[in-house]
């Protein structure tokens, strides 16, 4: 006989699971697939992203946040029972608020503003990645078109969100000096809202998934939702981390920022050059002792394999020459001493080096990331 038997179907797909087994199967999906495991989130929480990379995350995540009440409204319209509608509509209130200036979307806008965006730019959604839009829209369509059981089961990622929220808040407050508790106020409410919503949805799925096929559909729905979240981070990583290929219609660093940072000097391509500003640079002399102001630090970005200069409101990419100079800026060396050290290191004339680095130092001082 040459025909092959089909592979055996796992036992959990053939029989009706108990409520406890179904819950365990659902939670196992989160343990393996929830987006807290994505490399982008590990970088975000561990403080290894630049400010512009954090901005890209905040901007794209806004579209997801903004469409959550749209998704919930579509589901609400399909609920046949008034009691269920009363319970589910609280989700819409949580995000839209009871009045202007209230709700989760408003708090996410404050987060985006906190990292430098103008409100109008974020609201326009014109800078979000196409993959973000496709993923989020697919989720809205899924909830609108699939069975109520599948639609509700897809929301069960909220079972896992308290863990990622705790990691995110602690990690970002620790590792980014431009992030404050006020910036992350969105997550305060979600620590209580998400478990409440998850408890209701989990109970609904347990009671209404009454056949093996329906249980399988619920499991697949949660898997789909995890894929929606994961895909958004895949797109962010590809565009803004590695290989760093930003699509032509997506946000470019420097766009949509408040007036203080909406200039050429804030783009990642801006080097430590006085040409980046039209104002007259602050002159340095050989006897001056340059130093980094409080809150400004030189850091090696492991993700991009290059040094950056981090300031409270901006991030500068640095070329090798700027890095060599700034490594010697310790608040003790004069400009002439720095030039002498570099001359010995590179077997070059210190006078020529000093003449080269003076305008660079002046440009950095003009950008308020260097002082004397």
UniProtKB/Swiss-Prot annotation:
One of its GO terms (biological process) is sulfur compound metabolic process. Residues 264-283 have a biased composition (Low complexity). The keyword Oxidoreductase applies. It comes from the Bacteria. It is an enzyme of class 1 (oxidoreductase). Its EC number is 1.3.3.11. Residues 281-372 are annotated as: PqqD. The keyword GTP-binding does not apply. InterPro entries: Haem_Oase-like_multi-hlx, PqqC, PqqC-like, PQQD, PqqD_bac, PqqD_sf, Thiaminase-2/PQQC. This is Bifunctional coenzyme PQQ synthesis protein C/D. Residues 268-280 are annotated as: Linker. Pfam families: PqqD, TENA_THI-4. GO terms for molecular function: pyrroloquinoline-quinone synthase activity; quinone binding. The PqqC region is involved in ring cyclization and eight-electron oxidation of 3a-(2-amino-2-carboxyethyl)-4,5-dioxo-4,5,6,7,8,9-hexahydroquinoline-7,9-dicarboxylic-acid to PQQ. The PqqD region functions as a PqqA binding domain and presents PqqA to PqqE. The gene is pqqCD. Keywords: Oxidoreductase, PQQ biosynthesis. PANTHER family: 4-AMINOBENZOATE SYNTHASE, PQQC-LIKE PROTEIN. It comes from Methylorubrum extorquens (strain ATCC 14718 / DSM 1338 / JCM 2805 / NCIMB 9133 / AM1) (Methylobacterium extorquens). Residues 1-267 are annotated as: PqqC. Monomer. Interacts with PqqE. It catalyses: 6-(2-amino-2-carboxyethyl)-7,8-dioxo-1,2,3,4,7,8-hexahydroquinoline-2,4-dicarboxylate + 3 O2 = pyrroloquinoline quinone + 2 H2O2 + 2 H2O + H(+). Pathway: Cofactor biosynthesis; pyrroloquinoline quinone biosynthesis. Residues 260-288 are annotated as: Disordered. In the N-terminal section; belongs to the PqqC family. In the C-terminal section; belongs to the PqqD family. Disulfide bonds: none annotated.
